[in-house]
Amino acid sequence: MNIQASDLKQVITDAFNFEVVKLPLSAPDNQPTGYYGLFRDDLTGTDAVVGSSSVTSRYVPHTNDDVVALVEAASNVFDGDVDVKCHFNNGHYVSVKPTADHRINIYGDKDNIFPSIVISAGFDGRAFQATMGYYRDLCQNLAMMRQVSGTCQTIRHTRSLRPKMNDLIATFNQLEDGWNNLTNVIEHLETREVDLSQFLMAVYGSPEEDSKRSVTIHQNRIEAIFKRVRNERFYSGRPRMTNMVVSAWEAYNAVQGYAQHDSTRRGNATDFDRMLSASRDGFVKRAEELVLTA
C-alpha cells in the first residue's frame, strides 16, 4: 500500500502502538541493583522484556517519535508516495520503498529491482543504521549488499531526533549515491558469467564426508539452489542453463534467496525476520564478497 508523507506518522504509531520503557531491576531480596531493564509497556511478564541484557541509569531508550523521524527522513529520498513495512524484534525495523516507477530492468522486463531503505533501530546501545538495499520482483528478495560503497549510513542515537530533521534528511540523501553505485554494480554482475557449481563450492565448501547428515544437508541445499536458478531463468525469459554457466547476479541472488526463503528458521519467523536473518547470514556475505571481488 502506497502511503503519503503526511500519513507516515499514523502508520508508524499504529504499527508500533507501544513504547519501550526503562525500569529498575531488583535483586531477589528486593534490594536495588543499580541496573535497569527495558520493557514494552503493552505487555507483562517475560513477554515484555526487550533485549537480553541490562542497561545503566544513563541509558535513554529511543521513542516512537524517533522512529517516525527516521522514516520521514528516509521517505524524502524518494519522490512521491512510499510503501512502508514495520517490524519489532528487540528493536524497531522499517523498510521504506518507493512506487513502481523507480523500477530498473536488469534483464528484459521481468528481472527488475527497485530501491528499499531498511532502518534498524535497536536497543543495544549501537547507532541506528540505514541501509540502501534492493527488492527484486523475480524472487521477492529484499537484499542488502553492504560492501557496495555508500549503501550504509549510521545515525547516532541522541535524546531526541525530531529537532535534528535537517541533519537526518541530509544523511539519508547520501543513500541516493549508494543506490546509483548499487545499480551500477548489479548491471555489471549481470554481464559477468560464473560457473554456478564452482561458485556454490566456494560459498559453502565441501560437506564432512564422514557425516551422513552433513552430506544430506549439503546436497539438499545445492539441489534447492539449482532449482531456484532454473525457475528464475524460466520466469525471466532467460535461455536454459548450459554447462552450469549463469550470471554473477543470478548466482548471488540464488544464495541470498535460499537463505531468505528456503532455509530452516526457528520459531514462527515472519518475512521480515527471514530478510533480517539472511542479511546476517555468513554464506550470503561470502557470496557477496565473491561476486564483488572476482
Explain the meaning of each model-derived region.
Residues 1-69:
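Feature for intrinsically disordered/low-complexity regulatory segments and propeptides
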Residues 1-26, 30, 86-88, 101-294:
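Intrinsically disordered, low-complexity regions enriched in serine/threonine
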Residues 33-34, 50-54, 79, 151, ...:
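A near-ubiquitous, low-amplitude feature marking generic local secondary-structure context
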Residues 35-36, 46, 91-93, 127:
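A generic structural signal for beta-strand entry/edge sites
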Residues 38, 96-98, 119:
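Generic structural hydrophobic/aromatic packing signal, biased to beta-strands
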Residues 65, 90-92, 113:
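Residues at beta-strand starts and edge strands
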Residues 66-79:
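Hydrophobic, Leu/Ile/Phe/Ala-enriched alpha-helical segments that form helix-helix packing faces
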Residues 76-102:
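A short acidic/basic microdomain associated with nuclease active sites
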